[in-house]
């Protein structure tokens, strides 16, 4: 194992892992390092994890992935302190898009209405609906509202955006649009 201090605020740990270790094992180790730094030394830490490599010549690539993981995490998952490149998913793709393309996508999706026209309660409802896998009953229970109230809110969103969030394809488009909006808010002038 090697530790390198590359700047005043950045340190790199190169960890040898056994073949049977996986990314989850690395995330657990990283979380324990973060806990130690914060608990014992009062140092705020965020850890990015690159993909495991089999050859030392790929070290730079894995390091770059760890940096990207932290950058993407700052935009899409600000609460997490350990971010693995392998688990960035669609956020990694969105992060690499030019802002002009993202802005065009939002205009296409929301046509005359802006995503900004959705109030905080509506966005909270949508977020909970997504977290409950588009399940109306579970979401209404979690929000402590009547099922019909949730259906009414979803219908209101459909009228406003043209997207029926109970439809999987529409829900994906809306989820990506929310992520694109978050990305644009964090990176207003890329490309």
Regions found by a protein language model. Name each.
Residues 1-191:
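Cytosolic nucleotide-utilizing catalytic cores of signal-transduction proteins
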